[in-house]
């Protein structure tokens, strides 16, 4: 793991070596296979082994809202991952909660999942117990300028606490982070109103592309702020997530300029994947076309 505040990933430092990898190891956001991991009676260890068998080295999760990680305490889940040859890098959790719509069946009366505003200490404690190096916000309320400002405040606290526990904090984008709200975007506001050594972005390459953004232009605008990537593709016709290399995202252009971003970990993600063959084909395409 890098020292806190360092902007040069280990794989870049070692690039002169004949055995150094050109890019970070291929990882997977296991939300891609949530239909397996969240199924009743799921064999978590067996599923993690299947993930390792397709060539994945690192994983990111999207769970823990109730303190369990696919039914396991963080230490147990981390041990399962390690036993199958996987390294657990971090977990997605919500940021500033959205205000639920008022109705007779409003979800407001239900227990709220843990989030960074209300449960940051427990979330960081879980990440530390699991040996994670990152705490990641999956999404946050950003529909108004006030929400954007409050989201940034939550992220400042998350970045501080993560650093105090030898971890780092990142925010994962969707398309809405690039919407103009009272003359600003949540994406720009967060990056210009937080400490660049404590608050980073996990850039979802597909959703940034769908929002009309060039990821490389973002790297140039905010160099070193993108140590985490979601490597996701979008179907050229439907705009829905599809296996990497079969859609419209220009991965060769992006990876060629990866050093600008400060990338350390890349995670394949495919919302709506039908089976493990989908991420397996993404791994193979990356190995044949990017990691060759």
Residue ranges with predicted function:
Residues 3-7, 18, 98-200, 276:
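Active-site acidic/histidine proton-transfer and metal-coordination neighborhood
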Residues 34-41, 62-73, 95-101, 111-117, ...:
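Acidic-and-aromatic substrate-binding clefts and catalytic sites of carbohydrate-active enzymes
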Residues 24-30, 59-61, 88-93, 135-137, ...:
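Hydrophobic faces of well-ordered beta-strands that scaffold small-molecule active sites
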Residues 4-11, 15-27, 35-52, 131, ...:
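Histidine-acidic metal/acid-base catalytic patches
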Residues 2-129, 133, 163, 284, ...:
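N-terminal pre-domain/capping segments
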Residues 69-70, 74-76, 81, 134, ...:
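Non-transmembrane, interaction-prone segments in cytosolic or luminal domains
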Residues 31, 56, 92, 169-174, ...:
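Aromatic side chains
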